[in-house]
């Protein structure tokens, strides 16, 4: 219901205010919506903190709902950890480490589903891929497009009929996908 949804938003906004954040979920929704409308192929990446002092199960559930709704292409989730000398370290209602870890795992499990769905939508698309290496055991190259950040995102695994040199850009049609990686083949003659 709308009233329940708005209540969840307000609950989550209380945590954002406690963190000193100057944005709210409505602003984030608006910006993401405008970006996706202007650039349909955009990849939106964000990070979240869970287990901030005073965060409730209801606020965690509201965050889960937000993650599900926003369908971020890339998402990292960190658990809050107190840092000496900060206001938050001295706040009451510190969250138990086990709860923080559970909440992090719940968000990442949801994001894994979102990521899988997003990657499935990439099947059939053609991307420019920077080749970074070759996996001999699998007989495939690995690389990244503009969508994958080094050291944090998955790869695009590429089959090719001809040898490719690391550092080379190739045109790849995506043929399959899993939660975090794309699989494709070099397109030698591309016509759209």
Residue spans for each PLM region:
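Single conserved hydrophobic/aromatic residue that forms the stacking wall/gate
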Residues: 1-10
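Terminal RNA-binding accessory module
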Residues: 90-192
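A short acidic, helix-capping loop that chelates divalent metal ions and anchors anionic groups
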Residues: 13-18, 84-91
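Short, contiguous acidic/charged loop-to-helix segments that flank catalytic cores in large enzymes
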Residues: 18-26, 51-57, 94-98, 158-161
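Hydrophobic pocket-lining residues within nucleotide cofactor-binding pockets
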Residues: 11, 50, 80, 134, ...
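Conserved C-terminal portion of the radical SAM core fold
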Residues: 8, 26-86, 106-115
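Residue-level recognition of specific faces of alpha-helices
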Residues: 2, 15-18, 63, 74, ...
């Amino acid at each position: 219901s709308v009233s329940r949804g708005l209540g969840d938003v307000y609950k989550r906004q209380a945590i954002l205010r406690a963190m000193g954040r100057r944005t709210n979920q409505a602003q984030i929704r608006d910006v993401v919506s405008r970006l996706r409308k202007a650039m349909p192929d955009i990849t939106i990446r964000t990070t979240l903190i869970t287990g901030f002092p005073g965060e409730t199960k209801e606020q965690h559930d509201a965050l889960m709902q937000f993650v599900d709704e926003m369908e971020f292409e890339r998402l990292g989730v960190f658990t809050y950890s107190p840092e000496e000398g900060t206001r938050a370290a001295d706040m009451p209602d510190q969250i138990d480490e086990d709860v923080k870890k559970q909440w992090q795992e719940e968000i990442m499990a949801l994001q894994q589903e979102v990521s899988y769905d997003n990657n499935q939508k990439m099947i059939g698309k053609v991307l420019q891929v920077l080749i970074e290496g070759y996996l001999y055991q699998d007989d495939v190259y690995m690389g990244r497009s503009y969508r994958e950040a080094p050291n944090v995102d998955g790869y695009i695994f590429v089959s090719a009929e001809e040898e490719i040199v690391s550092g080379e850009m190739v045109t790849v049609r995506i043929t399959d996908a899993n939660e975090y990686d794309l699989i494709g083949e070099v397109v030698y003659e591309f016509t759209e």
